[in-house]
Amino acid sequence: MGVLKTCVLRRSACAAACFWRRTVIPKPPFRGISTTSARSTVMPAWVIDKYGKNEVLRFTQNMMLPIIHYPNEVIIKVHAASVNPIDVNMRSGYGATALNMKRDPLHMKTKGEEFPLTLGRDVSGVVMECGLDVKYFQPGDEVWAAVPPWKQGTLSEFVVVSGNEVSHKPKSLTHTQAASLPYVALTAWSAINKVGGLSDKNCKGKRALILGASGGVGTFAIQVMKAWGAHVTAVCSKDASELVRKLGADEVIDYTLGSVEEQLKSLKLFDFILDNVGGSTETWALNFLKKWSGATYVTLVTPFLLNMDRLGVADGMLQTGVTVGTKALKHLWQGVHYRWAFFMASGPYLDEIAELVDAGKIRPVIERTFPFSEVPEAFLKVERGHARGKTVVNVV
């Protein structure tokens, strides 16, 4: 009981921290949830019962309806969701050690208790039910959100999320368009703003390099940095060059023409580098930062989850700490900053992003949409890589 009380207080505190977001909405006298049946306790969803290849995806009509456990939670009827690379990786078991620890920090559950597991991180839909402490939303509100990977996902009829992870959907977007943005937008926002320290107040005139510019994170990063006045160089393949130029990239490097490192030598140095590629890129990318000027390299490709899968929680966290600390110190001595960034679920950040969207400064980039019946095909599309925007699933 003490643990439950502590969790409730913590979540309530998180919700209270966002009090400045909007005008508080008076609570309606009655809140009811609409489902496919007045007596229904189950819903349709795509789930996995074990980790593996695409064959583990299973459609069910009998997934339990989500319920509100904490007073700051809301239930959303999903109109559209999307598939991200993290979903494909999670389907295969990537990050299971760390995510299970987050789901069950006291190790009270037995192995495999996370199943059946629903994947999908993005949601655009309509609020159906609100917890008692939710003051910024009411049933009927159109909202969007990105669900943390340790929670049940959005490839289902309904999903429950914390109120501080939800934002009102941009008025200018349909649900299909809105579902393409939250996860990649918050990931890019984390890297550029929270870790990289850039914003509309200090970004003007800065030179930015985006490695892996044609995917979901890259296409958002181009647009937000251009909205803030930066000069953006994008690295992608030839067939994505037109796309990234239309999004605002000032210069485009085609990695199919040869060594990116060699091509970059003819350009001026950069103030900021966002790496969506990883691998060997960080062995040379930091050489293209301005030395001793606060220039920063931020990578979204880190060994954190892999270390915990391979070494266990304690050793994995120790190895991760040693790795990032060593690299950061090494590059600091060379006059540049080396950082890791991760997705951060945040309704207030989505509020800011929604303002940029409705102002016409950010537009969704959707490569393909799938009906709810073709979720496995959507996973295969994402798994093949070489994305030119997002893959969206229409649930309604």
Swiss-Prot record:
GO molecular function: oxidoreductase activity; zinc ion binding
UniProt xrefs under PANTHER family: ALCOHOL DEHYDROGENASE RELATED, RETICULON-4-INTERACTING PROTEIN 1, MITOCHONDRIAL
Positions contributing to NADPH binding: S214, G216, V217, S237, Y255, N276, L300, A341, F343, H386, A387, R388
Enzyme class: oxidoreductase
Lineage of producing organism: Eukaryota, Metazoa, Chordata, Craniata, Vertebrata
Organelle transit peptide residues: 1-40
InterPro entries membership: ADH-like_N, GroES-like_sf, NAD(P)-bd_dom_sf, PKS_ER, Quin_OxRdtase/zeta-crystal_CS, RTN4I1, YIM1/Zinc_Alcohol_DH_Fams
Organism: Mus musculus
Pfam families named among the record's database cross-references: ADH_N, ADH_zinc_N_2
UniProt keyword annotations, A-Z: Membrane, Mitochondrion, Mitochondrion outer membrane, NADP, Neurogenesis, Nucleotide-binding, Oxidoreductase, Transit peptide, Ubiquinone biosynthesis
Tissues expressing this chain: Widely expressed in mitochondria-enriched tissues. Found in heart, kidney, liver, brain and spinal cord.
The enzyme's E.C. designation: 1.6.5.-
A Gene Ontology biological process term: nervous system development
Superkingdom, natural source: Eukaryota
Name of the protein in question: NAD(P)H oxidoreductase RTN4IP1, mitochondrial
